[in-house]
């Protein structure tokens, strides 16, 4: 990715931004997530957003583009409500190489992200508390440890059953 230190200097915000060059332990990360008003991800090709999920596990709403695994986090598939602000995709590119033939990159606009931040900070204390409770419930029921274990187990059972039902013996003949 880009050199964030250089970016902060170019923007003139280097005195208000802190970068860590060391690994931050879980207890400190938990504190940071808990004191955050929201978590923003501007990823354009996210398989699954771990930082956004960690944030949600503390009840912190997220702002994220509707791309990849972030869509499942920011949009509650049960009722299509949002766990923060879901950013629409404003530009889509198709990238390819020898190792990865084709992959879409979905970009949300900076203007939409700015509006989302304004929306989050415009919520009343009661609205923030209600959203935080919703985010926390969704994160724990959909992505909590027991649910993950259950889904993993069910997937393995399905794979084994499908393999047994669809197994065909192949005879290889020499030509």
Which residues make up each language-model segment?
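Short glycine/serine-rich donor-binding loops of glycosyltransferases
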Residues: 49-52, 70
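Nucleotide-activated donor-binding/catalytic signature segment of Leloir-type glycosyltransferases, i.e.
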Residues: 1-23
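Short alpha-helical donor nucleotide-sugar binding micro-motif in glycosyltransferases
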Residues: 31-36
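Aromatic "clamp/platform" in nucleotide-sugar-dependent glycosyltransferases that forms part
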Residues: 44
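C-terminal alpha-helical cap of glycosyltransferases
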Residues: 145-175
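A short, well-ordered alpha-helix in the C-terminal region of glycosyltransferases
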Residues: 112, 119, 126-142
């Amino acid at each position: 990715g880009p050199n964030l230190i250089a970016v902060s200097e170019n923007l003139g915000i280097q005195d208000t931004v802190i970068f860590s060059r060391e690994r931050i332990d879980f207890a400190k990360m938990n504190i940071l997530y808990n004191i955050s008003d929201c978590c923003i991800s501007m990823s354009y090709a996210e398989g699954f957003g771990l930082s956004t999920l960690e944030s949600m596990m503390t009840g912190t709403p997220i702002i994220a583009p509707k791309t990849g695994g972030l869509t499942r986090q920011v949009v509650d598939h049960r009722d299509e409500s949002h766990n923060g602000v879901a950013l629409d995709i404003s530009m889509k590119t198709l990238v390819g190489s020898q190792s990865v033939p084709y992959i879409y990159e979905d970009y949300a606009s900076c203007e939409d992200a700015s509006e989302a931040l304004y929306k989050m900070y415009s919520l009343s204390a009661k609205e923030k508390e209600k959203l935080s409770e919703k985010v926390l419930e969704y994160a724990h029921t959909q992505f909590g440890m027991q649910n993950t274990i259950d889904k993993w187990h069910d997937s393995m059972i399905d794979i084994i059953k499908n393999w047994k039902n669809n197994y065909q013996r192949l005879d290889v003949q020499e030509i």
